[in-house]
Amino acid sequence: MCRFVIYKGTSPVQLCHLLTRPCHSIINQAFDSRLRLDRRRPINGDGFGVGWYDCTYDQELGSQPCIFTSVTPAWNNVNLTRLAEKIKSPLIFAHVRATTAGTLSLDNCHPFQFGKLMFMHNGGIAEFPKIKRRLQSYLPDDLFNMVNGNTGRSIQLRKLPNAYAKTFTPDQLRQAMVETIAEINVMTEEAGITEPSLLNFCVTDGESVVATRYISSRTDEAASLWFSSGTTFNEFAEGGHYKMSKMDKRENIILIASEPLTFEKADWMEIRTNHMVVVTPKMNLLQIPIIDKYYVPPSDPASMNRTTSFAAGKGLLSPRREITAETENCPAISI
């Protein structure tokens, strides 16, 4: 039942406007999820992480992202609160974790960094231990030696482009995610695994962003994923009530999140199951289908009849698709 949020903007934003100040910030989602309900792990308290790129390039510092992780609950980490008030970035990844695979350790806290690239994921590979050994045997030495955790991130690394290249294209990152998903499907099928895998992957090079919403099933919904875009994202009422404003046709800000950060229904669009979102360096947002045997085109009535029970049972989707409020400060909204 992990959560993540991505910010990409033409101007840098303080981390606190994503992490701490909104009444439904990702930190609040760690203990007060409204969209995803998981009776097994109701709290995302198994660590957190935030990664960001510098506002301007510095030759001495390089182009790699900085990542801060901890195994403590995000809402109880005073250092995170302090950093969030003092750091600005035009591209931010943040993640709160509820462990489903692997131990409670820094090595398993998202996001992860490999050269210039940063990535994180949500969901899980079905019966991952059955393919873990085979997967690791495919890794080249440099990747094998850097993977210390055991959450399945090694399969993402395998298909990524050269992390030390100076530049990447959005299509390179998009293709890497397509190939990653295809390889997972081949491995699970050959291992006789029939349970679907829920694969929400995110990767960035600091310029482009790719995020997938995917499930290896033609009849089930994938884990939730939303996006919001506009010209400003700010607090419009006391108590951490934020909204996305659209002053013109420009996209100055793009947010991608497991669960909306605001209770403004008009702010958010749901990403279709078995699609990916690609954000280009020029802030163009593309929603692209992941076409394989599990893809159901929107023209097919079956695309409207995917069931929510599987993802809901994993705590990755609400069966009602409703955010409910239990306090006066956060009004209810159906999505």
Set out the residue ranges of the language-model regions.
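Conserved short alpha-helical segments that host acidic/polar catalytic motifs at enzyme active sites
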Residues: 1-121, 125-335
